[in-house]
Amino acid sequence: MGSQETNLAPHVLIFPLPIQGHVNSMLRLAELLCLAELDITFIVSEFSHSRLIKHTNVASRFARYPGFQFQPISDGLPDDHPRAGERVMDILPSTKNVTGPLFKQMMVENKCFSSATRRPITCIIADGVLSFAGDFAQEKGIPLIYFRTVSACSFWACFCMPELIESGDIPIKGNGMDLIVKSVPGMETFLRRRDLPGFCRVNDINEPKLQILKTETRQTTRAQAAILNTFEDLEGPILSQIRKHMPRLFTIGPSHSHLTSRLETKNIKTLISSGSFWEEDRSCVDWLDAQPPRSVLYVSFGSITVVTRDQLLEFWYGLVNSGQRFLWVMRPDSIMGKDGQSQIPADLEEGTKARGYMVGWAPQEEVLNHPAIGGFLTHSGWNSTLESIVAGVPMICWPYFADQMINSRFVSEIWKIGLDMKDTCDRETIVKMVRELMEIRKDEFLQRADHMAKLAKEAVSEGGSSYSNLDGLVDYIKSLII
């Protein structure tokens, strides 16, 4: 190694699965590492990159970090592919079969992105479901760190999949959904079959989705280290189980508030770090400004969930009939097929005008922190769950698929900061749950949510567990320089 290279910063390659929630989490990690003066090459799909440039401040946000660079790559899907609903799973075989070979070629041709001012890749931080990135790292002798963008509880349940199959809990065929699952250590008293990750709801253990999940999760242990976007006070008992298999585990979350904390520590102006693939309609913030404190239920099912027209109408009637104010995010592509083009009943339109507001996409972090928000009807995606926890906002959980099923169980049964409405979509239940959250048990839920928000803030403040773990991660990466 030349003396010039000796003085160069560590160079980290970060590679997320190209869907919004994963890209968002790993962009925040990238910025946290930039603040520690590490060089970052961020692999991003061409589709994701174009959406980020069009709809967010990502260009100006990272312009202040000269050591950061995007490296676009194809995700193998046509631009008009929906990348939502069940079809979002198409991204896994596509990235493996198309992106994988392109990535390998890119790394070889670019000499691991080294230059006169940038050392070759020090380590690869890959999304935990991109095993081909791990294969390349092992082949080239590059240290590998996996970032799992899901909750610790979801990762651990997936890790225990061989035991779940052996015990007969998987595949879930529709019967016995409320039976307690005994083969996930640490969850033996409260985890039901219906709470297992959505990919477990298959008729055959050879189902490709199930096999991908099983394979990708178990291979995580080959990495030298792993990162989770969570914090010790939230998932400590489950983290203890994971550390038996992966002792070098860095919990650095909630990453969005951790980033804010670090920027404030360095007296850097905080830019709202949206990673949205859709244009945000900020008119909803003006509407919230005119509402009483803690009076509005925020409704958003994330970047992937799609609903049928029947489900849409049940939610809509439930919200209107509850008598509560609501702000509802309805993505343009969130209604299945042509269902969304049908006529909306007049009574729903009138009820919405009186107490509701609807937008195609919202600045969620800002909305959840608005004083008018009193509850969050959510799909229980992990980023949304953490954002709600940080904001001290109780939740009604209507999980759609994947890790969301188990997240919603923890929200209701373990953390007790909300209600679980999974596998139900009728207006009477929605009315009942909305009133329970926003009226009947409002003070109880707000008190618990406020306590959890304080724990989250402590974790990312100087001396907190996540703050210390990020410092430890940076030190570990620096130690990898040969």
From Swiss-Prot:
GO terms for molecular function: 7-deoxyloganetic acid glucosyltransferase activity; quercetin 3-O-glucosyltransferase activity; quercetin 7-O-glucosyltransferase activity; UDP-glucosyltransferase activity. InterPro entries: UDP_glucos_trans, UDP_glycos_trans_CS. Its EC number is 2.4.1.323. Pfam families: UDPGT. It catalyses: 7-deoxyloganetate + UDP-alpha-D-glucose = 7-deoxyloganate + UDP + H(+). UDP-alpha-D-glucose binds at residues 149, 362, 364, 379, 382-384, 387, 403-404. One of its GO terms (biological process) is (-)-secologanin biosynthetic process. Keywords: Glycosyltransferase, Transferase. CDD domains: GT1_Gtf-like (cd03784). The active site is at 22 (proton acceptor), 127 (charge relay). Expressed in leaves, roots and stems. Lower levels of expression in flowers. Preferentially expressed in internal phloem parenchyma cells. It is an enzyme of class 2 (transferase). Disulfide bonds: none annotated. An anthocyanidin binds at residues 22, 402. Iridoid glucosyltransferase acting exclusively on 7-deoxyloganetic acid. No activity with 7-deoxyloganetin. Catalyzes the fourth to last step in secologanin biosynthesis. Belongs to the UDP-glycosyltransferase family. This is 7-deoxyloganetic acid glucosyltransferase. It comes from Catharanthus roseus. The gene is UGT709C2.
